[in-house]
Amino acid sequence: MLFLGLAWLVLAACIAAGCFTPAHRLPTWLPNDKLLHFGAYFALAFPMAFVTQSWSRLLLIAIGLSIAGFLIEIVQRYIPGRDFSIADMVANTGGVVMGIGAGYMCLALHQALPDSLGTLL
């Protein structure tokens, strides 16, 4: 569990670094901005289903990650070459919802497998 927590913090720090970098310093080869937002928040949310199976806690985590995305968008308004984007917030929240949903489905599938199959995966 400690490794998962540390990996999550490193991922969050990398995402934050990308979010707070002025536009002229970002690589030009990056794919679609909205896909990056969706993927980043999906990656942050996915492991949360393995940390807690409580729907109320997952809802709080989803709200917290979505609020973090909103606050980052506000800060980006003051970073050279970056701007506030509602479409980015939608992509962030979509990534959170799909990440938690996919994580929960993977966990449920793993728990539903017979023990003999579960050891193979």
Regions found by a protein language model. Give the residues of each.
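Bulky hydrophobic segments
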Residues: 1-89, 93, 97-121
